[in-house]
Amino acid sequence: MEGARLQAVVTANIREFQRKMAAVNRIVRTTANRVTVTVDSRTEKFENAMNRLARITGSLSTVIGGALRGALMSAFPAAVPAAASLVGVVGSLGPMLGVAAGGAAGLGSAFATAGAGAVAYGALAATSIGGVIKASQDLDKLQAKLDDATDAKERAKIMEQIKNLQASLGKEERKALDTLEDFKSNWQDIAKSVQKPILRTFTTSLNTFKSVLNQLQPMFRGLARGGESLAKSMQNAFKAPDMKNFINYLNTEAPGAFVSFGKISGNIIRTVMNLMVAFGPLGKNMTKSIEGATAAWVKWSASLGSSVKFQKFIAYVQTNGPKLLKIIGNLSSGITSLFTGFAPLSADMMTSLVNLTARFKEWAASAKDSKEFKSFIDYIRTNGPIVWDSLGKIAKTLINLAVAMAPVGSEVLKMVNSFAQWTAATTKAHPEIGKFMAVAISLGGALRALTPVIISFQTLFGGFSSIGKAIDLIKKFKTSAAGIKLAAAIADMKLFTKTNALMAAQMAKTKFTNMITQLGLFGTKLRLQMSIMAAYLKQLVVAAAQQTAFAVKMAASYAQMKITSFITALKNGIIQMGLWIKNMAIMAAQSAANAVKMAAAWTAARISAFASMLAAGIKQMIAFGVRLAALAAAAAANAARMAASWVIAMGPIGWITAAVIALVALIIANWDKIKEYTVKIWGAVSKWLSDAWNKIKQAASVVWQALVTLIKKNFEMQKKIVTTVWNTIKSVSSKVWNGIKSFLSSVWNGIVNAGKTVWNGLKTFFTAWLNFQKKTWSTIWNAVKTAVTKVWKGIVSVGKTVWNGLKSFFTSWLNGQKKLFSTVWNAVKTAVTNVWNKLKSAASSTFNALKSSVTNIMNKVKDKIKSIWNSVMSFFKGINLGSIGRNIMQGLINGVTSMWGRVTSTFSRLTNAIPKTIKKILGIHSPSRLMRDEIGYHIGTGLVKGITGTEGMVTKAAASLAKSAVPEVPTVPELAVNSSYSGGMVEQSVNASLENFDLPEKNIIIQMDKREVGRAVEEPVREFTGRKRKRR
């Protein structure tokens, strides 16, 4: 295609064109070379005419404006009632808002009342349901105990408890309990069906949580240490004076504030309750209104599904909903892009505003201290009250003027209203007047707009006579030889131009086809070049990314190496510091232990010396006592020897008497000495002991203070050393970390700047390239679009012409068909209507005849049934059914009562014979144990199985019995009953009979070995007689 050539053969009759152009040139040469037109300069006349027009227009505007202003001024008093009405409208908004607020308050009262009712219902329901749930739980516990019990006595006791618990419940409570048990059973079945997957889920979740918790152990330890630190900080904080002041403030003010806010809450609650009561009627009405509205909503919503219009609406929304969302998305994106485009301008504006506000701040800060600003403030203080006073007086004047103008305004308003009413009625009765006014206004405006143009044209060109002359000259030239030749030349020129246009169009079409072909080749080449460029850019971006990643990796490796070395050095330093602190702590502990040992040894030595001295003193006292006792004994022996002979002579009685007297006399005689000596000895001993104890305590206190001082000094020294070392480590670590951080920041910033530079370069290149491509394609597209548009317009024009022809043809044909069909349809409709009316009349007459005959028959039947019913009721009136039923029941009761003794004796004989027979046949030694552990248990199990197995049969029998007991009685409409025999009499008679019919239940107890082994209940007489009837 690149070597193809475009060849076009153009056939043009140039000679004919040249011949025609020569004729035109000859005509031109025969025309005069110069044409002189006399033009008068009429600028002064134009200016005068314009000034005159301006004066007239201004005068008219002034006069009309003055008239309108006068009319408005005369109607100004009408503004007073209008303003009053406006005030009334605004004031009416208040009651409207009050009504709305009252309705809202009433609705709130209704909601609150409903809420209180719901709470009360919930409380009562919780109480009632709680009793049932508690009974269910107790039954479950007793059932569990029964399942675990192995002893028959214990099982019987549990069964008795279950029976008592069930008997303590009411009818509805038992029903609710049964329903609850059924629900629990159903829930257990559901739980069992989904137990395995739930447990697997639970196991998986626990394992997951376990792994997560194990991974979070460092966090937990850190949190624990942090909590400990916070606790210590909190402890120190609560020791601060401000916290003590706060606690004192709470101790003083909290009780009063609590009481005050409690009273406030109580008052608010009482207010709300009073408001609820006050708004109760309104709330009731609001509730009923809302209930009716919601019922209407339900009906409306129920009919929406079958509504064709609603389905059309849904279809419309489904069709146009995405369009709306797309519109919103486009608007959002467009606004975001627009704001993004305005972002630089907004930044500049905000920068300018920052500078402006900063200058304003500086000016305001300097203005408040300036003399001029203070003078301005003083001026405002002086003249401000005067201004406000003047405004108040002006307002009062305007108010008084409005009050004075109110009567006049009312009359003027009536006049304006009458005029407006007249104009409205006139324009309504005669619309031509309104049309005439509209046309007059439009013509006036057009005349006002065209008058300056007309006057200007007339003034400049001397009126319209010159235009008439020019038109006459053109007409004469058209009929002259020169005009005819010129017209022929113009016609030939049109023909030549048309021929050349067709040739140019054919050439353009051929060129356009060639251009499209070339554009296709160019597009193929362009796509190839774009693919090559994209591959190149891809390689360039990949290489840049690889270089960036390599640089980041190198920087990260370097940083990691530095950080690793720093962490290793820091770790080693911390280990060494820990060892040093450990050694210092061990040395301090050893020093403290040695000091304690020395103090303990010194204390032990002092205590040992004191104990030795105390033992020696005690030993001396004992020796002194022993010696004193020996002297006393010797003196007593001498005295005894001296008085022995005299005592022997006295006899036993004298001996005893003399000994007692001597002893008493000796004690009395030496009492003061004994007391004084004893006190002296004890005082010396106690003083010595006290002095020794004080010396020991003083020595121990000195030793303890020295020990405490030594330990404190050692601890302070160790603390100071550790703090200094830690601060050094922290400072070095901070400097190293800041260096690493600064280095990494500089490396990262360099990488970011390099990436930004590369990105900006790529962006600039691609932006220029894309703009070039966009411009090229835009030019090509515009050319293609123009050509296609022209072709399309031609096709549309032809299509419109064809469509209009078809539309007119089918319209006329359809109108003819419609007219024909309408004529036929009207004839058919008339005939069918006549036939239908005749049929309807015949059917109506037939139905009325049938209705009258059936009504007569039914009336006769009804009268017959009434007579039969009255006869029956009159028969039963003469019979006392109550006494007859009472006598029958009483006879049955007497018969059963007379036979009761034989029944009990028979049962007694049976009960006496049963134990002996059972013991003899079965060899039973303890019937109670056998009946309790084996027979009773198996009888109960058999009864349970039998009742459960025959439950369906019993249900069907009961249903059949109920169905047969209630026969279907046909309904007789309009059945009249004799009013003299009331239903209350029949009900009273039946109730009286049934009261005598009921009998108490009879308990039958079966005993074996003087123990109760069974119990039966004899049902009322009806069942008893039924059983007798069955035996027969």
UniProtKB/Swiss-Prot annotation:
Location in or out of the cell: Virion
GO annotation, cellular component aspect: virion component
Stretches of the chain forming a coiled coil according to its record: 131-178
Broad class of where this protein is predominantly found: virion
Alphabetical keyword list: Coiled coil, Viral release from host cell, Viral tail assembly, Virion
GO biological process: viral tail assembly
General function of this protein: Serves as a base for tail tube protein polymerization and acts as a template for tail length determination.
Protein name (database record): Tail tape measure protein gp18
